[in-house]
Amino acid sequence: MARKEFRYRGYTLEELQEMPLDDVIKLFPSRQRRSLKRGFLPRQKKVLEKIRKIKKEGKTEGRPPVIRTHCRDMIVLPEMVGMTFGIHNGKEFVEVKIQPEMIGCYFGEFAPTRKKVEHGDPGMGATRFSMFVPLK
């Protein structure tokens, strides 16, 4: 079975990439749209400059370089599709390859800051029952 072609609000990825940014912003949900209408923050502009520099140099073929960023509030734009970002989760950089389905989401959604706690087995003396367990 053939894979279904990706569409965002009725537009293909190629159409989204050719559209001016103002038209793409109109397609986003209200929270993202309002955030982008206010303009990009300096750290977001820096990420966009890095993206455009890499695309201009033609390093997008093969395995493009990883763009490391602490900017978790950056919104995924169509021009970012296919690139790899190292998004900081507070401890380390989580590598995320941007897929078309991620358009309109925040970077922070793909690098969770907390992980599930996995407790080990209780040790000796951890419970009252352990008094009756013979030591090995």
Swiss-Prot record:
Gene3D superfamilies: 30s Ribosomal Protein S19, Chain A (3.30.860.10). The keyword Chaperone does not apply. Pfam families: Ribosomal_S19. Disulfide bonds: none annotated. GO terms for biological process: ribosomal small subunit assembly; translation. The keyword RNA-binding applies. It comes from the Archaea. Keywords: Ribonucleoprotein, Ribosomal protein, RNA-binding, rRNA-binding. GO terms for molecular function: rRNA binding; structural constituent of ribosome. InterPro entries: Ribosomal_uS19, Ribosomal_uS19_CS, Ribosomal_uS19_euk/arc, Ribosomal_uS19_SF. GO terms for cellular component: cytosolic small ribosomal subunit. Protein S19 forms a complex with S13 that binds strongly to the 16S ribosomal RNA. Belongs to the universal ribosomal protein uS19 family. HAMAP family: Ribosomal_uS19. This is Small ribosomal subunit protein uS19. The gene is rps19.
